[in-house]
């Protein structure tokens, strides 16, 4: 009888609930940080600014759309914010290609766990898993291919939105109220400090996130602001008890038009 089309023994053998463990055993060359030769990092696209903030019902995460390679704009439409699962979201800054792969692997890790265990991993558990994945990229980070993610989600046990930041070694740190990462984060975080307030609703939090990215783009060449001419808007997402939601582009267009009208009226003081 032909074995053609049948899954191999590795796929049928009971094992860990971690997809990372499975990949480490059977295809380690596919993991981040396992295939680079020593040497200087070539000029590769970099993703830039990500912001996140909590609001009354959950968390908002947003990212600009620009990727740079040195002084050149490599892309005006890259997406840096992705759903990790139904109740969490990940944003990536740093080496764009590796960051996108890391986000996809993290999605698979959470999906694999849910299929094996029959339940969702806790938000703290998800944050820890992301730190483990990031630590696997350390050899590449030592060569200049650094990825720094931002993770947020709705904690079903606490009934609140939470935010986690990371360093290049996989260290995990819980942030309160708001945070930003990437080249424009210093400017975005200044805006968040001024605009964030307790008890905001989702619409207010989305507006604050867009304003923070606008301020970052105003001072950081590697961060792209809203582009009304090309109709390119930031990726803005919310996560609440109802789950993950990406804010539609028509809503963002209306919000940006209002924001630009106010700032145009202020002139040089905007």
Curated annotation (Swiss-Prot):
The UniProt entry lists the main location of this chain as cytoplasm
Q: Where is the active site?
A: 48 (nucleophile)
Reaction it catalyzes? Cleavage of peptide bonds with very broad specificity
**Enzyme nomenclature, EC number:** 3.4.25.1
CDD domains associated with the record = proteasome_protease_HslV (cd01906)
Subunit info here reads:
The 20S proteasome core is composed of 14 alpha and 14 beta subunits that assemble into four stacked heptameric rings, resulting in a barrel-shaped structure. The two inner rings, each composed of seven catalytic beta subunits, are sandwiched by two outer rings, each composed of seven alpha subunits. The catalytic chamber with the active sites is on the inside of the barrel. Has a gated structure, the ends of the cylinder being occluded by the N-termini of the alpha-subunits. Is capped by the proteasome-associated ATPase, ARC.
Q: Which NCBIfam families match?
A: 20S_bact_beta (TIGR03690)
Q: What is this protein called?
A: Proteasome subunit beta
**Gene that codes for this?**
prcB
């Amino acid at each position: 009888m032909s074995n053609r089309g049948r899954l191999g023994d590795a796929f049928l053998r009971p094992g860990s609930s971690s997809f990372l463990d499975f990949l480490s055993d059977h295809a380690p060359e596919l993991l981040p940080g396992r295939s680079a030769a020593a040497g200087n990092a070539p000029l590769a696209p970099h993703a830039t600014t990500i912001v996140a903030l909590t609001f009354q019902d959950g968390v908002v995460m947003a990212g600009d759309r620009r990727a740079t390679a040195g002084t050149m704009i490599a892309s005006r439409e890259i997406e840096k914010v992705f759903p990790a699962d139904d109740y969490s979201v990940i944003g990536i800054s740093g080496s764009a290609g590796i960051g996108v792969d890391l986000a996809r692997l993290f999605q698979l890790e959470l999906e694999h766990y849910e299929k094996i265990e029959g339940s969702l991993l806790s938000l703290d558990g998800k944050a820890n898993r992301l730190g483990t994945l990031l630590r696997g990229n350390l050899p590449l980070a030592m060569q200049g291919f650094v990825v720094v993610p931002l993770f947020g989600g709705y904690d079903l046990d606490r009934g609140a939105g939470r935010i986690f930041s990371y360093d290049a070694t996989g260290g995990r740190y819980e942030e309160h109220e708001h945070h930003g990462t990437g080249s424009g984060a210093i400017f975005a975080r200044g805006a968040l400090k001024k605009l964030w307030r307790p008890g905001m609703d989702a619409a207010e939090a989305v507006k604050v996130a867009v304003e923070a990215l606008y301020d970052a783009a105003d001072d950081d060449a590697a961060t792209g602001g809203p582009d009304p001419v090309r109709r390119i808007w930031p990726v803005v997402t919310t996560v609440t008890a109802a789950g993950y939601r990406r804010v539609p582009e028509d809503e963002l267009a209306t919000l940006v038009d209002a924001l630009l009208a106010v700032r145009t009226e202020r002139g040089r003081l905007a």
